[in-house]
Structures are given as C-alpha cells and as structure tokens.
Amino acid sequence: MSYVKEAFDKVKLRDPDQPEFHQAVWEVLETLEPVFQKHQKYQDARILERLTEPERVISFRVPWVDDKGVVQVNRGMRVEFNSAIGPYKGGLRFHPSVNLGIIKFLGFEQILKNALTTRPIGGGKGGSDFDPKGKSDFGSNEILSVFHE
C-alpha cells in the first residue's frame, strides 16, 4: 500500500463521520503521491499525518439573545491546522449545515491557499451552525463577538 493511501485510510478511520473533510484531503493527497514516491524523507517525517491532523480543535457554545428576547444557543468551532510558517489565518462560516467536518475541510484547504500567497501565515477556519439570514444586526453581532474573544 502506498504511503498516501495509508495516510488517507488513517484520516477516514480517525474521522469516519466527516465526508467533506475526506474528499478535500483525498483530492490533495492524490496529487501529491508522485512527490512522496520520489522523496522518502517526507514519508519518514510523516508529513501527511502532520498535515491532515489539526494542531488544535476548539468547540464551544454560543449563547445569544434573539429579537424577541429569547436566549438561543448555537455551536461554534475553530480548527487551527498548521502554524509552521506563521500564525493561523482563515475566515468564518455561518450556516445551519456547519459541522466539524466542514470546518476541517475549509481549514485544510486554507493551509494550501495561505501557503500560495507566500506570506508567513498558517491555516485555520472557524464557524457556527448559526444562520444569519433574517437575523437582526444585534443577534449577528452577538455571535461575531464570541469569535473575536
């Protein structure tokens, strides 16, 4: 079995409920296979395992008050993938479908996008299952303030 396939199988085994993350990882790893076949030192350093496992995953509750004065609670998360070339950088995604697999997929791709800029920044992403559509600025700002802390 190739190193790339072995590393991908570990990702699927470790995170079986994250198909979006699996797809993003496979698309990247598949294109890198010739590099890993040619350079054993990258395999020895376990580069793919280090690339596909976040340095940190933070999950937290996000309480906020809606326009009717009712407290609502959403889930927030932040995935910080790689700070090898600099501090984490990545945006926020707010949508009812957001889950850890989606945030990991977006954070994983952010590593590569940031590396291409040649700026010294790593990759990360944050988000919440909060749906900003139809919400007042007050409710949306409450959610955003949690991510700025």
Annotate each language-model stretch with its function.
Residues 1-149:
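N-terminal ligand-binding/catalytic initiation module
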